[in-house]
UniProtKB/Swiss-Prot annotation:
It catalyses: DNA(n) + a 2'-deoxyribonucleoside 5'-triphosphate = DNA(n+1) + diphosphate. It is an enzyme of class 2 (transferase). One of its GO terms (molecular function) is DNA binding. Residues 55-75, 471-492 are annotated as: Disordered. The keyword Nucleotidyltransferase applies. Telomerase consist of two subunit, p80 and p95 that form a 1:1:1 complex with the 159 nt telomerase RNA. This is Telomerase component p95. Disulfide bonds: none annotated. Keywords: Chromosome, DNA-binding, Nucleotidyltransferase, Nucleus, RNA-directed DNA polymerase, Telomere, Transferase. Transmembrane segments: none annotated. It is found in: Nucleus; Chromosome, Telomere. Signal peptide: none annotated. Ribonucleoprotein DNA polymerase that catalyzes the de novo synthesis of telomeric simple sequence repeats. Subunit p95 contains some or all of the template-independent primer DNA-binding site termed the anchor site.
Amino acid sequence: MSRRNQKKPQAPIGNETNLDFVLQNLEVYKSQIEHYKTQQQQIKEEDLKLLKFKNQDQDGNSGNDDDDEENNSNKQQELLRRVNQIKQQVQLIKKVGSKVEKDLNLNEDENKKNGLSEQQVKEEQLRTITEEQVKYQNLVFNMDYQLDLNESGGHRRHRRETDYDTEKWFEISHDQKNYVSIYANQKTSYCWWLKDYFNKNNYDHLNVSINRLETEAEFYAFDDFSQTIKLTNNSYQTVNIDVNFDNNLCILALLRFLLSLERFNILNIRSSYTRNQYNFEKIGELLETIFAVVFSHRHLQGIHLQVPCEAFQYLVNSSSQISVKDSQLQVYSFSTDLKLVDTNKVQDYFKFLQEFPRLTHVSQQAIPVSATNAVENLNVLLKKVKHANLNLVSIPTQFNFDFYFVNLQHLKLEFGLEPNILTKQKLENLLLSIKQSKNLKFLRLNFYTYVAQETSRKQILKQATTIKNLKNNKNQEETPETKDETPSESTSGMKFFDHLSELTELEDFSVNLQATQEIYDSLHKLLIRSTNLKKFKLSYKYEMEKSKMDTFIDLKNIYETLNNLKRCSVNISNPHGNISYELTNKDSTFYKFKLTLNQELQHAKYTFKQNEFQFNNVKSAKIESSSLESLEDIDSLCKSIASCKNLQNVNIIASLLYPNNIQKNPFNKPNLLFFKQFEQLKNLENVSINCILDQHILNSISEFLEKNKKIKAFILKRYYLLQYYLDYTKLFKTLQQLPELNQVYINQQLEELTVSEVHKQVWENHKQKAFYEPLCEFIKESSQTLQLIDFDQNTVSDDSIKKILESISESKYHHYLRLNPSQSSSLIKSENEEIQELLKACDEKGVLVKAYYKFPLCLPTGTYYDYNSDRW
């Protein structure tokens, strides 16, 4: 979650601490100014190089390429935008910084000139902070919000034709200063709205809700208001209208309002009020007039319609009233499901869209193309556009799936067809059609009724050998074709990715279909051969028959293939949530790895037992699994992670399928190394562990921490089943010795473990000796680098909380302690005088912080505040 959506944090209590906090952040902002200056100078240099290049190109070539000119122009505009953005950020930091410097006497030369000693300056600063404490806290805390707001660039005032996602093209701005809303109902005071409107008159975006006009008087009041707006002659970038299509007065008001608008670029018409069926017979002519007004608007560049499907025929009928010769329309989107419309109207609909001379983006929700003429008209339309988003729910049986995709740069294609329609030959023709689009950069395919064939174990092994041989020869100029493929069953899958690997410009590819071994093997080919692929996503359907283990799909080769990727980000997932695999590329040397495995996936264990990830470039890994069957699987998981030698961040969430039988019994697995294997990760800085623990596993964590001196953040979360009588002494002693430790988070909930009355006192003594006393010693004696201690425990006994508060109050260095919110509330309400005195002492020292306060150098824990977990 971005900073702008977070609750305002609160600084620690205590005037001296508040002063230190403000001064420390001031130094951070000063360093940011220098950073922005450097970045600004670099961008200026790049901008000058680009200008020089363009001038040389113009001098040397009288007939230079228009595309090159456009690319250079776009780059220059982007650089200029970034330079201006950095200027604004520098000015913002300077403005706040200079005010704080002046008010807090931070100018040493000025202090010497006025004869102020360091002690006098400190006293004056404390007095100022005490008098206006909230003011200076807010100055510091609001800086991140303002910088984030500036970094986002506000709303997009100009949209380029090259934008891929047509849905995003229609998004309304969220900048409160630049859009205004009108509500047409009986309670609206249009006089007040007009007064406010004329005072500002600088809105870029207009939102209108026409849903509650019940009487003619209300209609005429809104109509008079519409005609008054017409006199202002204002222009808008976006007009967003929400209308009730079940109300005739609202439909008429929509027409009158559209006629009152002189100039706007993007129009969204939708209906938040829906019903199962509409009867538009009485107002059909009115709807035709509305569509004629919309499509005849001379300034309109984008139209997004989300209207009832019953209005579709009136849209087609209105085409005879529309002259498109001078139309500026570039982007068109119809996001209503049209499965039940008259199929005879569809061919006229595509023919109507063909006539717009500047149309480049077409997005169409589910529509039946069951007539041959409709398919032919669709192909003619596809010849004109560069970006197409189509969902086809029916295709003529005689059509051979020969589409015209040659000119497309962006294609999102979904098929909702009967399995028998999409035959092997038709699928082959479709992929050959896509293959012809040499400039295609974005491709998304969804075959949600595609039925795959079963694959035998023998065939799997044979194809695995084929792919391995292919990978070994990938550096040759041409990859040899395999000769030993099994015949007909593998053809559709293998050819599928073979065709796509020839799309040399393809950067973003996503596919959703039924998975077979052939599809996985051909996926390997695609990843090996595609030189420009930057993003790949596979969502597959997988159903294993328990009685037929020979249908098992082997995932072994995919990890080996992905290990060799240098540029591509990969996402592989199952719709049922069985597996989700992500490898995110930041640049050529930084990757982020995320793997989620759930218990229904039978081959999860092979991921850890048979393969090591060995991603040499991976620096951040998050692995979540609820499918591990034994402690050996956890050990294998640790081994796989330890093979990523450059890891800096690790987040592990590992649970077992059947943990109940080992809850109260020792695991007794001395031969397993568990987390001790992390000793190999010499660059590891941040660790988060959430898995079942026994003393052996807990000791393995301590052993690897002893060898890894770069650890900055250590997070140990509670697993829902805990072992009794664990000793945390060694763990806290090891953490105490880490020289760069900045953050510790402990969530073990020991108080929730219950014992019989006979053993209660023994258990209480053990908790004090093996957990609370080592924790308090750690708090007292930790290194100066430790900033935050997160103690997330719902309930703590009075004796234990006293020891913790005493430790943080008497600690050798200044640390911050954050308690569980419920625990904090109970402490405030406590009638124990000793606890209240300790709380007061901690407040004066400024060591207790609220749950939602954010420390810039600390990682999110996901417990108190909703930060983006992808920071791991």
